[in-house]
Amino acid sequence: MERFVLKFLLIDKVIAVCLDQKISNERLNPLTEYFFWPQRDAWEDMKNFIDNNDWIDPKDAVNILNRITEVINFWEESAQLKKEDIKNLNIKFPDCVFIVM
């Protein structure tokens, strides 16, 4: 997943995810809007986006969807994450960006 970055917004009882493409070490190109969970199925929304963009390598697609599953499961098991928990999230998922609202 070195060509992509998943960004997660943590908002009370909602988690949102979007996908960015790395252009360089410092620049990102947004590819999707934020997909929200549990109001909608963020995983399914991301899968639909990936399926409609055949330039995304299948291996990257699997890694992206697996990472979303891991983060959502961690978030659900943790009940309510606080700003202090960002450090733990960054350690557990160093390839993602987390923003607590």
UniProtKB/Swiss-Prot annotation:
Q: Could you name the domain of life of the organism this protein comes from? A: Eukaryota
Q: Which cysteines are joined by disulfide bonds?
A: none
Q: Which UniProt keywords apply?
A: Chloroplast, Plastid, Ribonucleoprotein, Ribosomal protein
One GO cellular component term: ribosome
The keyword Ribonucleoprotein belongs to this UniProt entry's keyword annotation = yes
Q: Which GO terms describe its biological process?
A: translation
Pfam families for this protein: PSRP-3_Ycf65 (PF04839)
Where does this polypeptide localize?
A: Plastid, Chloroplast
Record text on subunit structure and interactions: Part of the 30S ribosomal subunit.
* Family per similarity comment: Belongs to the chloroplast-specific ribosomal protein cS23 family.
Q: What job does this protein perform?
A: Probably a ribosomal protein or a ribosome-associated protein.
What protein name applies here? Small ribosomal subunit protein cS23
According to its UniProt entry, this protein's organism is: Euglena mutabilis
| Gene transcribed to yield this protein | ycf65
